[in-house]
């Protein structure tokens, strides 16, 4: 199956009750020019409206953070574990994650990313479990990368905060940006001002 056919399946999915509340399923978008896939938790209201991932305030923060690293948003594939918006933007439950996980596994199998960046605990837990590992608290795995196989693809899974958490707690912004810099191979050198 190719990505376009998979995304059509996602748009018409009724595997869990979330399909009753959505305006649009949000399969994901972007290219694999850098071999990177970014995986969030679930769409929010803006994403549900647009049918595109990370287009609301959290998406703007992510896009700005990528831009600071010289990374164009369209050069990475961006998606979520859960493809439909949970009511009131609540955290997706286990049933919803399990219903959508086969879609994410298929996306990984088709796109064959070298690196996956998990944003937030729901994404980290789901992807770590696919690698045969566990993640109970984000603090235990945040800022770290793990080697493993998902969908038969050898990947490096790197974990950081979800941008929505950074919006709620702006003190996390620097750490979020540093994690992304490390994950994209830029290290912290990009943030050093040579004039100081």
From Swiss-Prot:
The keyword Heme does not apply. It is an enzyme of class 3 (hydrolase). CDD domains: UDG-F4_TTUDGA_SPO1dp_like. [4Fe-4S] cluster binds at residues 13, 16, 84, 100. Keywords: 4Fe-4S, DNA damage, DNA repair, Hydrolase, Iron, Iron-sulfur, Metal-binding. It catalyses: Hydrolyzes single-stranded DNA or mismatched double-stranded DNA and polynucleotides, releasing free uracil. Uracil binds at residues 40-42, 54, 80, 162. Its EC number is 3.2.2.27. GO terms for biological process: DNA repair. SMART domains: UDG, UreE_C. One of its GO terms (molecular function) is 4 iron, 4 sulfur cluster binding. InterPro entries: Type-4_UDG (IPR053423), UDG_Type-4/5 (IPR051536), Ura-DNA_glyco_family4 (IPR005273), Uracil-DNA_glycosylase-like (IPR005122), Uracil-DNA_glycosylase-like_sf (IPR036895). Highly thermostable. Removes uracil bases that are present in DNA as a result of either deamination of cytosine or misincorporation of dUMP instead of dTMP. Can remove uracil from double-stranded DNA containing either a U/G or U/A base pair as well as from single-stranded DNA. The 4Fe-4S cluster may have a structural rather than a catalytic role. Belongs to the uracil-DNA glycosylase (UDG) superfamily. Type 4 (UDGa) family. This is Type-4 uracil-DNA glycosylase. It comes from Pyrobaculum aerophilum (strain ATCC 51768 / DSM 7523 / JCM 9630 / CIP 104966 / NBRC 100827 / IM2). The lineage of its organism: Archaea, Thermoproteota, Thermoprotei, Thermoproteales, Thermoproteaceae.
């Amino acid at each position: 199956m190719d990505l376009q056919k998979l995304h059509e399946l996602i748009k018409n999915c009724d595997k869990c009750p979330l399909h009753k509340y959505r305006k649009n399923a949000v399969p994901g978008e972007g290219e694999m020019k850098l071999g990177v896939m970014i995986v969030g938790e679930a769409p929010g209201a803006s994403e549900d409206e647009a049918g595109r991932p990370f287009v609301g305030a959290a998406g703007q923060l992510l896009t700005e953070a990528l831009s600071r690293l010289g990374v164009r948003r369209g050069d990475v594939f961006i998606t979520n574990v859960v493809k439909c918006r949970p009511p009131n933007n609540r955290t997706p439950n286990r049933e919803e994650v399990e219903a959508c996980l086969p879609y994410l596994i298929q996306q990984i199998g088709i796109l064959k990313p070298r690196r996956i960046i998990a944003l937030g605990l729901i994404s980290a837990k789901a992807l770590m479990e696919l690698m045969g590992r566990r993640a109970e608290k984000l603090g235990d795995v945040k800022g770290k990368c793990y080697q493993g196989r998902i969908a038969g693809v050898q990947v490096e899974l790197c974990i950081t905060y979800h941008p929505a958490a950074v919006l709620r707690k702006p003190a996390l912004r620097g750490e979020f940006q540093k994690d992304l810099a490390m994950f994209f191979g830029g290290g912290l050198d990009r943030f050093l001002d040579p004039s100081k």
